[in-house]
């Protein structure tokens, strides 16, 4: 009995002395008693004995960010028992030791942390004091970010607020919307502000809703970026990245003669953005030079997704302007509603030809005239070239002359044999026979661009490769107001 009291007294003195517990491999050392009564660390080969109450602390790995749990030390008497009254008798199980949370100093949060977590532009300028505020409330960076928290965080930065953007020049106006050139206070970058009025009884145009729903999920270097959405009682404002001009304006500025190397770069980027859309099961369905935006670096981006996934392709816009037929495939012109990714590939072929020659391939003003232009160059279809065409009521109504197909190379002499072959594969009567965007990128026409261009991540520009450079145009005008009278800055869908 005296021997046990001596052991308890020694243990009590140790605890009162505040001797810390060494940590090995992130776990506390166990204190035990051997047969001789001496206190010491347990051998790794032995089973650990009961730990002394009030001394053990939870181990925390060096990289853990969870708050540390600390068992509260109890005052111990000379016999090794607690001086505090116990609610249990000696033959009952002792209650668990009370715990308290140890608060660690808040983790420093960087601008890079915020940009990565909230998917912000790298050049964003955060409001003064925002970093400090987040540092005090950093748990949102220690756990998955809910949609509500992300929305609140973006709002605090300035997203979703009209006052974050400065309107500069008016670029276009339609029945439902006005488009402005603007500037972001967050980045100092130029933006395009598409302000859609909601005072109409039917609310926001379905094209705008469709465009928003698609673009917020499409992240690609060759697709225009939707930066922000601002919804008020009277308007819906879409904030897009701002690009210098569209392909039509680029053609105008070049005197309709684009360097063939640049034609190849523009076509590859068009196919690259389109292939990404098609992988996402999205059809553009309104490809034309005015919907392809180009910046000073030569980056081409698909814009205006207002008709994507539409149940039908209208002949007029919201401002009652006629939608151009020049880039519409013959199967759609003849009433087909069997939409697939090949619907876009015909338009790619027409745009390819226009870049190579400086003029539209099929400039019809009515459906009948448009088909006439197509058949005069590609030949009037027969049952052999287009099975089932003779039973098409629309086709029979027009009663076209029997044209023979002409060589495309004779109409586009600047194309080499590979270019003419690719153009032929794009301009097939039946959609199922047209080459896909993915396969077109692998066509021999693009061999000179090298292999690395096919291995880039979706969000990386082709101009990130040192071997890819836009060549200087022989007659490029730098005027901000082309002869057509339109500003040399194209934004997304100025037609409504």
Curated annotation (Swiss-Prot):
GO terms for molecular function: ATP binding; cyclin-dependent protein serine/threonine kinase activity; protein serine kinase activity; protein serine/threonine kinase activity. ATP binds at residues 171-179, 194. The modification Phosphoserine is found at residues 12, 36, 42, 64-65, 78, 82, 89, 95, 110, 119, 138, 146, 153, 155, 391, 478, 480. Keywords: ATP-binding, Cell membrane, Cytoplasm, Cytoplasmic vesicle, Differentiation, Kinase, Membrane, Nucleotide-binding, Phosphoprotein, Serine/threonine-protein kinase, Spermatogenesis, Synapse, Synaptosome, Transferase. Phosphorylation of CDK16 is essential for the binding of CCNY, but also essential for the regulation of CDK16 kinase activity. Phosphorylation of CDK16 is essential for the binding of CCNYl1, but also essential for the regulation of CDK16 kinase activity. Ser-146 and Ser-153 are the most critical sites for the binding of CCNYL1 and for modulating CDK16 kinase activity. Phosphorylation at Ser-153 inhibits kinase activity. Changing residue 153 to D: Abolishes interaction with CCNY. Residues 1-97 are annotated as: Disordered. It catalyses: L-seryl-[protein] + ATP = O-phospho-L-seryl-[protein] + ADP + H(+); L-threonyl-[protein] + ATP = O-phospho-L-threonyl-[protein] + ADP + H(+). Residues 165-446 form the Protein kinase domain. PROSITE patterns: PROTEIN_KINASE_ATP, PROTEIN_KINASE_DOM, PROTEIN_KINASE_ST. The active site is at 286 (proton acceptor). Changing residue 153 to A: Constitutively activated, due to loss of an inhibitory phosphorylation site. Increases interaction with CCNY. Residues 83-93 have a biased composition (Polar residues). Its main location: cytoplasm. It is found in: Cytoplasm; Cytoplasmic vesicle, Secretory vesicle; Cell membrane; Synapse, Synaptosome. Changing residue 194 to R: Loss of kinase activity. One of its GO terms (biological process) is spermatogenesis. It is a peripheral membrane protein. Protein kinase that plays a role in vesicle-mediated transport processes and exocytosis. Regulates GH1 release by brain neurons. Phosphorylates NSF, and thereby regulates NSF oligomerization. Required for normal spermatogenesis. Regulates neuron differentiation and dendrite development. Plays a role in the regulation of insulin secretion in response to changes in blood glucose levels. Can phosphorylate CCNY at 'Ser-336' (in vitro). Found in a complex containing CABLES1, CDK17 and TDRD7. Interacts with BRSK2. Identified in a complex with NSF, syntaxin-1, synaptotagmin, SYN1, SYP and CDK5R1. Interacts with YWHAH, YWHAQ and YWHAZ. Interacts with CCNY; this interaction increases the CDK16 kinase activity. Interacts with CCNYL1; this interaction mutually increases the stability of CDK16 and CCNYL1 and increases the kinase activity of CDK16. Interacts with NSF. This is Cyclin-dependent kinase 16. It comes from Homo sapiens (Human).
């Amino acid at each position: 009995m005296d021997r046990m009291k001596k052991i308890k007294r020694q243990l009590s003195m140790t605890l009162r002395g505040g001797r810390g517990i060494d940590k090995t491999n992130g776990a506390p050392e166990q204190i035990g008693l051997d047969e001789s009564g001496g206190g010491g660390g347990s051998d790794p080969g032995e089973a650990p004995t009961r730990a002394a109450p009030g001394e053990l602390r939870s181990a925390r790995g060096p990289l853990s960010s969870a708050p540390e749990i600390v068992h509260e030390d109890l005052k111990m008497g000379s016999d090794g028992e607690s001086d505090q009254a116990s609610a249990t008798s000696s033959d009952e199980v002792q209650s668990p030791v009370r715990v308290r949370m140890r608060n660690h100093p808040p983790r420093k949060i960087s601008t890079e942390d915020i940009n990565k977590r909230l998917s912000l532009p790298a050049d964003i300028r955060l409001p003064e004091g925002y970093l400090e505020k987040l540092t005090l409330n950093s748990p949102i960076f220690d756990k998955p970010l809910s949609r509500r928290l992300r929305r609140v965080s973006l709002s605090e930065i300035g997203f979703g607020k009209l006052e974050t953007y400065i309107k500069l020049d008016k670029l276009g106006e339609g029945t439902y919307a006005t488009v402005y050139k603007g500037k972001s206070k967050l980045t100092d970058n130029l933006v395009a502000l598409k302000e859609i009025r909601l005072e109409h009884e039917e609310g926001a145009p379905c094209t705008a809703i469709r465009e928003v729903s698609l673009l917020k999920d499409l992240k690609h270097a060759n697709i225009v970026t939707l930066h922000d959405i601002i919804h008020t009682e009277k308007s819906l404002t879409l904030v897009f990245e701002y690009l210098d001009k569209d392909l039509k304006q680029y053609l105008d500025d070049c005197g309709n003669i684009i360097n063939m190397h640049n034609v190849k770069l523009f076509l590859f980027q068009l196919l690259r953005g389109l292939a990404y859309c098609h992988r996402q099961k999205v059809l553009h369905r309104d490809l034309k030079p005015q919907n392809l935006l180009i910046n000073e670096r030569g980056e081409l981006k698909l814009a205006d997704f207002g008709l994507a996934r539409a149940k039908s392709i209208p002949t007029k816009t919201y401002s009652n302007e006629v939608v151009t037929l020049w880039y519409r495939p013959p199967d759609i012109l003849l009433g087909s509603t069997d939409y697939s990714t090949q619907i876009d590939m015909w338009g790619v072929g027409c745009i390819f030809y226009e870049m190579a020659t400086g003029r539209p391939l099929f400039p019809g003003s009515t459906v009948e005239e448009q088909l006439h232009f197509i058949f005069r160059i590609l030949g009037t279809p027969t049952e052999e070239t287009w099975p089932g065409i003779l039973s098409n009521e629309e086709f029979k109504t027009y009663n076209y002359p029997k044209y023979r197909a002409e060589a495309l190379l004779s109409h586009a002499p600047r194309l080499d044999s590979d270019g003419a072959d690719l153009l032929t594969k794009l301009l097939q009567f039946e959609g199922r026979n047209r080459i896909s965007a993915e396969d077109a990128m692998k066509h021999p026409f693009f061999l000179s661009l090298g292999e690395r261009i096919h291995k880039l991540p979706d969000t990386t520009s082709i101009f990130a490769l040192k071997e890819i450079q836009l060549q200087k145009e022989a007659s490029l005008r730098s005027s901000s107001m082309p002869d057509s009278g339109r500003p040399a800055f194209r934004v997304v869908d100025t037609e409504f």
